[in-house]
């Protein structure tokens, strides 16, 4: 199973738990963290069964361009691969548009969630879209792992769905402002360089200090600010930190001032 790296922390272990071997493919930071199509082509063997795609991306904030989206779909068709598309942040797009693999359900499994679109992160309720053949197989596994989400949560989501559009209409511009503020402040920190994320709720800057990301994240945490070490998202994530702008502008400003002070003291 080909998985993006830097990528969400669960892709590798989920592949292993399914009895597969995860193989990482890179994202081109200089192009807004677009998947490296040439590398993906080189990594495919007769044992490759699936390609995991995440757009908008956690942790990078990258959003697939139409060109890359079409190239991935063509690769899947040519090599008879399943695409597993994580589209949890599809409603949080600030630049460009979201391209969904719902266009290719004959060989795609699209995974989504209400965690972000309805701000119900802790409820752990989502959904998937694919073809009937895949649904039949997934249903078997699903029954023996969790059966179903709690009924009260299902009712709460059902009641909330009609107002989801209005909620997102109000929330997304707020997150866009937070995104711009965070990236601007990160790029003002000596040695930091942050690509502007086009979607999701994270910034993923690089830093020039010769300190492992896990150690640097711990130092920053000891001063009261939480960020995620890049290494948590795979070896290709080392040298980065992930910051979330799902916080007030005041907290973003105060938190990044702390980060700046920490960096300047090292």
Residue ranges of predicted features:
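Conserved PLP-anchoring active-site segment centered on the Schiff-base-forming lysine
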Residues: 1-15
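Conserved core segment of the aminotransferase class I/II
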Residues: 106-176, 180-185, 263
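PLP-dependent enzyme catalytic core of the Aspartate aminotransferase-like
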Residues: 41-42, 209-211, 215, 222-228, ...
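Active-site phosphate-binding strand-loop segment of PLP-dependent enzymes
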Residues: 23, 27-95
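Hydrophobic/aromatic ligand-binding patch that stacks against planar heteroaromatic rings
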Residues: 13-15, 75, 100-101
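Short hydrophobic/aromatic beta-strand micro-patches
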Residues: 129, 204-206, 244-246
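Helix C-cap/helix->beta junction micro-motif
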Residues: 18, 78-79, 223, 266
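Conserved glycine-rich beta-strand-loop-beta hairpin in the small C-terminal domain of fold type I
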Residues: 158, 174-183, 194-207, 237
